[in-house]
């Protein structure tokens, strides 16, 4: 990815992740969904499964790659936000759910899609 501000690089990574997942057959339900408990980058539907997708981009792997950047605290924030999403969007409340991560490391110029990255 081009050398841009951190925010723009993140937006580019989300766009790239969204295009990849849609190409794989997932359908977008929400993007950058905000609540008091956090933000969900992408909420998608894979068949009947609601998929909460965290997109991580790393320009530099000096402190670890994109996948390494999701620690226990970040996972907990995502779980809380997903629970709130399901409360607010009740039509999806009884659907199976999973948490995926799309990790993009610029030095490898590669997108890694990790399905079921962690459990709630």
Swiss-Prot record:
Alphabetized Gene3D superfamilies for the sequence: 3.40.1350.10
Alphabetized GO MF terms: nucleic acid binding
Stored CDD domains: PoNe_Nuclease
Top-rank taxon: Bacteria
SUPFAM superfamilies reported for this sequence: Restriction endonuclease-like
Family indicated by similarity: Belongs to the UPF0102 family.
Name of the protein described by the UniProt record: UPF0102 protein Pfl01_4685
